[in-house]
Amino acid sequence: MNSKIDSAIPFIGSLTALISGYSLHEWASLFGILFGAVSVWIAYRKYKEDVQARKDELAYKMLVAKIEAKKLGIAIDE
C-alpha cells in the first residue's frame, strides 16, 4: 500500500478515539469557549470600525469648520 495512507490511518484512528471519548458536557464547554472567543473577536473588530468612523467624522467636521472659518475671514492656524 501507499506509505502516506499507512501513516495516516493510525492518526485518523487516534483522532476518532479522542473525539468519541468526550462527553456531552465536555463538548458544550469546548463550544462555549470557542463561541466566546469568536464573539470577543467580532466585538473587537466592530469597536475598531466604530473608532475609525468617529475619527473620520471628526476629520470631516474639522474640514467643514475650517472652510466656514475661511469664508468668514477668520484666521486659521494650520
UniProtKB/Swiss-Prot annotation:
It is a multi-pass membrane protein. It comes from the Viruses. It is found in: Host cell inner membrane. Keywords: Cytolysis, Host cell inner membrane, Host cell lysis by virus, Host cell membrane, Host membrane, Membrane, Transmembrane, Transmembrane helix, Viral release from host cell. The keyword Kinase does not apply. Residues 1-6, 47-78 are cytoplasmic. Residues 24-29 are periplasmic. InterPro entries: Phage_holin_HP1. One of its GO terms (biological process) is killing of cells of another organism. One of its GO terms (cellular component) is membrane. The keyword Glycosyltransferase does not apply. The chain crosses the membrane at residues 7-23, 30-46. Accumulates harmlessly in the cytoplasmic membrane until it reaches a critical concentration that triggers the formation of nanometer-scale pores (pinholes) causing host cell membrane depolarization and endolysin refolding and release into the periplasmic space. Once the pinholin has permeabilized the host cell membrane, the SAR-endolysin is released into the periplasm and breaks down the peptidoglycan layer. Determines the precise timing of host cell lysis. This is Holin.
